[in-house]
Amino acid sequence: MNWFFTLASIVIVLDQLTKKIAVMILKEKESVTLIPDWLKFTYAENNGIAFGMEFAPKEVMILLVGTISLLIALYVFRSKNRTTRFILPFALVFGGGVGNMIDRITGGKVIDFIHIDLYNGMIMGTWVSLWPIFNIADSAITIGACLLILFHSTIFPDQSVQKNTDVH
């Protein structure tokens, strides 16, 4: 369990620190280009969830994310699985969720600043930006979710297979 909270704390600290730096350096600027036509830092405030979609009022989002985070921590705590493949994804999702929840509680919105500029332009007469501006917490949640999918069979072994092998 210490490994879980250590990893989650690292995500939260990195997320909050980079957001503070983004506010200090980027808030008054348009963007800072790191790799032309690909990667830049652009300050943005997000009232919604993924891709800026507004899902619910701030208070509901805080309650929802807080509940999900608590359930993740309880699930990890109650599980006997202490492998890296189990702990790492859940710690990333938990840390990312808490990092963004801190923003919602303290400022009412999430600070985003990493901008992968894949394509901005017209598609079928509509202006689109094909990649959202995001932050460290969003990255941790996404990576954690991908790891859960990737390692699903080792994290959650099929119980019916175990029961069948126990009978023989």
From Swiss-Prot:
GO cellular component annotations of the record: plasma membrane
BP terms from Gene Ontology: proteolysis
Keywords: Aspartyl protease, Cell inner membrane, Cell membrane, Hydrolase, Membrane, Protease, Transmembrane, Transmembrane helix
The UniProt record lists the keyword Protease: yes
Topological type in the membrane: Multi-pass membrane protein
Segments traversing the membrane: 57-77, 86-106, 131-151
Cross-referenced InterPro entries: Peptidase_A8
Pfam family, one: Peptidase_A8
Active site, renumbered: D112, D138
Function summary: This protein specifically catalyzes the removal of signal peptides from prolipoproteins.
Classification via NCBIfam families: lspA (TIGR00077), PRK14787.1 (NF011368)
HAMAP family xref list: LspA
Stated name of the protein: Lipoprotein signal peptidase
Source organism of this protein record: Chlorobium phaeobacteroides (strain DSM 266 / SMG 266 / 2430)
Species classification: Bacteria, Pseudomonadati, Chlorobiota, Chlorobiia, Chlorobiales
Gene: lspA
